[in-house]
């Protein structure tokens, strides 16, 4: 009996020694994972973009007709999707808010605070995220707005509008529209993206869907990339 126990103990020690030596050899031969030297930077590398989730706090914005969700909540979700898409493309993203809050008790000071964030962060672009609403439930489709006196913003709005139509294929293909928007009063290209109509039950359902939000954000990012590509081409000419 003692011989059997001794034999089993010796075998166990031998097996353990072989495993230890082979494991040590594997670790010694393992190559560290290094970043690829030829990895290309994203198309938005070097750009800083401010993403503004419209409304917040006491200002709920529009309200969805079916779910009764406030616009401020969906804006925040969508702004997060914008951030992910833009950062994936290499941009540095500044968020005006990442929670339900306002920056002042009145509308104009609240907007001023958001604009100041863009100045302080030396943003190259401003994207303000909103949801639309109309008295008719038939209206649908995303739409981009810009200030009529800003040529770069007009170009940016056209790039984003075209990308959203191409990717999302909405029933109603809207055109980018000019207006007098205080939130877009910076010297940098600035647009207001109305992602869709909360007054349209079908579109409301889409706007609350995570997959659709991601798809829309990727379309916006594509438009932003196209804008900077066009501006780079202008500089080279």
What kind of feature is each model-predicted range?
Residues 92, 172-175, 189:
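Conserved beta-strand segments of alpha/beta enzyme cores
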Residues 63, 121, 128, 135, ...:
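Active-site-adjacent mobile loop/cap segments within catalytic or ligand-binding domains
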Residues 6-22:
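Hydrophobic membrane-insertion alpha-helices, especially the h-region
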Residues 152-177:
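Active-site-adjacent substrate-binding region
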Residues 1-4:
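Positively charged n-region of N-terminal signal peptides that target proteins for export
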């Amino acid at each position: 009996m003692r011989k059997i126990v001794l034999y089993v103990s010796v075998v166990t020690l031998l097996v353990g020694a072989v495993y230890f030596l082979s494991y040590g050899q594997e670790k010694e031969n393992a190559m560290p994972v290094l970043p690829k030297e030829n990895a290309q930077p994203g198309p938005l590398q070097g750009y800083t973009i401010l993403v503004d989730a419209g409304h917040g706090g006491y200002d709920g914005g529009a309200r969805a007709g079916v779910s009764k969700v406030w616009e401020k909540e969906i804006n925040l979700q969508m702004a997060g999707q914008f951030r992910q898409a833009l950062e994936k493309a290499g941009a540095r993203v500044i968020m005006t808010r990442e929670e339900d809050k306002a920056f002042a008790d009145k509308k104009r000071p609240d907007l001023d605070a958001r604009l100041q964030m863009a100045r302080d962060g030396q943003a190259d672009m401003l994207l303000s995220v909103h949801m639309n609403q109309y008295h008719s439930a038939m209206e649908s489709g995303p739409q981009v707005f810009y200030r009529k006196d800003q040529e770069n913003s007009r170009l940016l709005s056209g790039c984003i509008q075209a990308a959203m139509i191409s990717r999302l294929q909405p029933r109603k293909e809207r055109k980018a529209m000019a207006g007098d928007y205080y939130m877009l009063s910076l010297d940098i290209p600035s647009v207001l993206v109305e992602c869709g109509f909360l007054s349209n039950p079908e579109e409301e359902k889409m706007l609350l869907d995570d997959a659709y939000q991601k798809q829309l954000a990727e379309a916006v990012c594509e438009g932003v990339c196209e804008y900077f590509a066009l501006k780079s081409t202008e500089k080279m000419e």
